[in-house]
Amino acid sequence: MKNDRLEAYPTMSRRAALSAVAAAMGSVAFATETPQRSRLGLVAYNCAIRRKWLQQRDPKFDLFEPLTFLKHCRDVGAGGMQTSLGVLDAARVKSLRDFADEQKLVIDGIVNPPKDDGDLARFEAEIRTAAEVGVQAVRTVVMPGRRYEQFKSLAEVREAEAKAVKMLELAAPIVTKHRVKLAVENHKDQRLDERLALYKHLSCEFIGATVDTGNSFALLDDPYGAIEALAPYAFTVHFKDQALREYEHGFLLADIPLGQGSFDMQRITAILKRAKPDIRMLLELITRDPLKVPCLTDSYWATMPSVVGSDLARTLRFVREHPAKTLQEVGSWSLEKQVELEDANISASLKFAREVLAM
């Protein structure tokens, strides 16, 4: 691959990124005026840099404490949150639920699935808390890491899938008992056909999907077809735009503010709303350096030997036809500048969701 393709779409310069920060500073958390509200909530991972920055100032303060984070989401103009709730006592449950009801905010939880019989008590305690809080859903992941990084062969993938099935079979009676929707994310772990087969095998009313609108692209699934196929199973959504660019071993995939990336967010919104008109979605935008998807390497294909070449061709064609103008590379920045960009990314996304997507 020629280097001039990379040079035609440079990464965001520090000056350009700081200009983006300045443009969005009017509605971040520490602004003096309360921003307008979007229905789009925030996944806790969006604010990981701010959490780290705040803990450096005060090690005892945790932005991700559920009520603290829900108030932060309200303050920046988001419509709710997705975060780990853990196990909360009755007073904390009441405070969280009352605040959410008063402010009309959605709450999603995050939970680890039960590893084995010995882990069921922990899992049920967290699900009971989620039920008492009144969550829309509880998001989970059942396979570790990104498929093309975590595993070396298809056999390893199949072994992890078997463990995932066992964990979800353990979880099913508990989430059914408490009537809590367990939403399994497409986490760059299974291709679309594999994930649909998992849902059909489980056939549980309370096990469905966290539809991540970008992850399936990393496994060469059709960018919009995957969302359409997963949408009927959706209990919640990781709503994201992503910037694409070729590199010598495949393509780069980077979270970017809504409307600034390579995907048609209006089309994605329409697909999801058509299938689930009342679903409340959560922005997932992790401010970090781009991820590498090495789809032109032997190691990548070792875990997906039966995927056809036309899927690769479609994916690379999409990357070439929809290159983002900029990518954000922030790893070398100071923590203070990173948190400013993180705030600005969230602010710009909520503004786009509110003004363009009517969310």
Q: How does the language model describe each region?
A:
Residues 24-32, 88, 102-108, 114-208, ...:
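Active-site acidic/histidine proton-transfer and metal-coordination neighborhood
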Residues 38-45, 81-83, 107-111, 138-140, ...:
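Hydrophobic faces of well-ordered beta-strands that scaffold small-molecule active sites
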Residues 46-64, 111-120, 154, 158-159:
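Active-site mouth loops of central-metabolism enzymes
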Residues 64-87, 134:
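Catalytic domains of carbohydrate-active enzymes, especially glycoside hydrolases
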Residues 1-12:
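N-terminal secretory signal peptides
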Residues 82-93, 113-121, 148, 186-193, ...:
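Acidic-and-aromatic substrate-binding clefts and catalytic sites of carbohydrate-active enzymes
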Residues 2, 17-22, 32-41, 46-59, ...:
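Histidine-acidic metal/acid-base catalytic patches
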